[in-house]
Amino acid sequence: MRPYVSPVYNVMAIPVEKIKANDYNPNRVAPPEMKLLELSIWEDGYTQPIVCYYDHENDEYIVVDGFHRYSVMKTSKRIYTRERGMLPVVVIDKDLGERMASTIRHNRARGSHS
């Protein structure tokens, strides 16, 4: 039996075109916070990988956590250009129910900020 290795030790650069949003993300971010996230990524770069599930059948990555960071890459031309369209991704191999629970846990762990 292989020892457990956390996904963060296996970050990969994946073309954003191979990444798809999930259809269950419950988290919403207001436009001012999205602008701040874009600025943060512009100033500091991507400091956390996007958590994805790899769908072998369709050869694509489905976002589990990091939807808004993914969205910034899709909507900010300057970031897309600088990053050459590549996103840092870690993969978790879980079924849909477990992925949904992971998404909720990640969102709740960050909490809300005022």
Residue ranges of each PLM-predicted region?
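General secondary-structure edge motif
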Residues: 14-21, 53
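Amphipathic, charge-rich alpha-helical segments that serve as recognition/docking helices
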Residues: 7, 20-48, 70-114
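Short, conserved phosphate/pyrophosphate- and ester-handling motifs at nucleotide-, phospho-/glycolipid
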Residues: 66
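N-terminal leader/domain-start detector
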Residues: 1-16
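Short active-site oxyanion
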Residues: 58-62
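A short acidic-Thr-Gly-centered motif at the start of a beta-strand
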Residues: 48-57
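Noncatalytic linker/hinge segments flanking ATPase motor cores
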Residues: 3-5, 34, 54-55
